Amino acid sequence: MPLIVDASVTVAWFVRNQATGYTDRIRRQARKERLHVPAIWPLEFANALWQLERRRLLSGRQVDTIVDLVEPLEIAVHGESPPPRRLLALARDHDLSAYDASYLDLALRLRYPVACRDGPLRKAVRAAGAKLA
């Protein structure tokens, strides 16, 4: 089944000190499944890598290598963002950031499980009747 993956999970595939058994399992599953992300994902992914580089936890060369490895993955970026009213409703109902609400919205629309490590988003996915990967 296709998966919705958040940026922290995808970063953990390439940054070993951020990997967990969960992210490793999702990485193996992702090799066989189509991945889906909301429009915010490229910004979050790039920002996470930039923060790691900026703090000198990764070199610029390592970050560039990660980007080279991610680009060929079949990640469907859903460019249409939900209307602000929809994001606000989900954020209010589940005490989420608008960014996390975009992942929840995508999960509810596509009915695909969400792979994330974020506690509030995991709780919201369950509460909204969506599935976790």
What residues fall within each predicted segment?
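Short, well-structured N-terminal submotif of metal-dependent ribonuclease cores
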Residues: M1-I40, L52-T65
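Acidic, PIN/NYN-like endoribonuclease modules and their adjacent C-terminal/linker elements
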Residues: P2, L104-A133
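Histidine- and aromatic-rich ligand-binding microenvironments
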Residues: V5-D6, Q18, H36-A39, D95-S97, ...
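Alpha-helix capping/helix-boundary segments
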Residues: V9-T10, W41, P83, Y103, ...
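Phosphate- and divalent-cation-binding pockets in alpha/beta enzyme and binding domains
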Residues: Y22, E44, R86, K123-A124
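Active-site-proximal, substrate-binding regions of enzyme catalytic domains
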Residues: A46-E74, R86
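Active-site neighborhoods of divalent-metal-dependent phosphate/nucleic-acid chemistry enzymes
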Residues: E74-R117
